[in-house]
Amino acid sequence: KEGAIGLVILAVLILLVMPMFLDIFRLNLMGKYLTFAFVAIGLVLCWGHGGILSLGQGIFFGIGGYCMAMFLKLEASDMQSTAAQTTPGIPDFMDWNQITSLPGFWEPFHSFGFTLFAIIIIPILLAFIIGFAMFTRRVGDVYFSIIMQAIVAILTILIIGQQGFTGGINGITDLKTLHGWDI
């Protein structure tokens, strides 16, 4: 137990000290490594300890990331920076797809508080619904993996097919700031 506490203290110290000594490129790279480490830990818990191979754990990670990207894109799509568009104030990919107003499901993402809430709650709710449906029917072994892969395919087709609302295959790009801080 003392070893675990020591590791936590060391990790916190490293995370507090690293921003002081690393340039922005290395700091962003370290952030990406830590983010992907969380995904890997989720796979280890699911497959390594639970014995359930999930080929779709990335959808929950991706949905959380997409929620943050929606907030960042709305922040980057203010009236000044989008003045050259046909419809100023909406994300550029929506303007390119002739969408003239911000869709209703994008509106709450103007709020950073809602975005942080959505990053956690939306993937949890989706995982609960999928898990409840599959585990109450005692789906296991390879069938769990096949169903998860099918859900990934469905979401991929949905996201790419709704390019005007989601950014399609390119996703949400050109994210520059978070509350005025360069990212």
Q: Where do the protein language model's features map onto the residues?
A:
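Transmembrane alpha-helices and adjacent helix-loop boundaries
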Residues: 1-183
